[in-house]
Regions:
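Glycine-rich phosphate-binding loop of ATP-grasp-fold ATP-dependent ligases
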Residues: 1-2
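PLP-dependent aminotransferase class I/II
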Residues: 5-177
């Protein structure tokens, strides 16, 4: 399911999801399109989930706030919030300070020992083996995406987590510094 601010955005998204074919008597494409479609079952599940979306966002924001409060003062940064945005906090990510002496692998190993699942931040496309021979352009010597990958950790943030669960994750992380 895709939510759009305007009907024009919705029409453009539908165009891209249906191969971006132009209104011509032949297959003509002025944009790269895709063949994305959602099954009726998936659409029905998505519609049903819309009823609980405000609650889920509230839960995710509470989890993020708890992490932020509990991890305050450590050599790491939580995701920032722009004044012009209301983040849904779908994913909670921390960035370790470059000189903190702890790597994402260290942190994930310690969390794993405590039976807590965490993940590396997504590996950038330019570092994927399949794209090794493809050109990559960056405005800086060290691309932002590479830096985020090198320092980022995705923390558990399922809406079924209790605040005690979040506190336990934080306790393990605090024990590393």
């Amino acid at each position: 399911m895709l939510l759009c601010r305007t009907e024009e955005e919705a029409k453009h998204a539908l165009k891209l999801a249906t191969q971006a074919r132009e209104n011509a008597p032949w297959y003509q494409h002025e944009e790269i399109g895709y063949n994305y479609r959602m099954s009726n079952i998936s659409a029905g599940i998505g519609r049903g989930q819309m009823k609980v979306l405000p609650l889920r966002v509230e839960q995710k924001q509470a989890i993020f706030a708890r992490y932020s409060e509990n991890l305050k003062g450590l050599p790491l940064t939580m995701q920032p919030k722009l004044d012009c945005a209301k983040p849904n906090r779908w994913l909670t990510v921390l960035l370790l300070d470059a000189d903190c002496g702890v790597t994402p692998a260290d942190m994930l190993g310690r969390l794993n020992e405590a039976n807590i699942e965490g993940r590396h931040l997504w590996k950038p496309m330019n570092l994927q083996p399949i794209f090794a021979d493809c050109p990559f352009v960056s405005v800086s010597e060290k691309p932002v995406c590479d830096d985020l990958f090198a320092r980022g950790v995705c923390l558990p943030s399922d809406t079924k987590m209790s605040m005690d669960d979040v506190d336990r994750v934080c306790e393990v992380i605090r024990g590393m510094f």
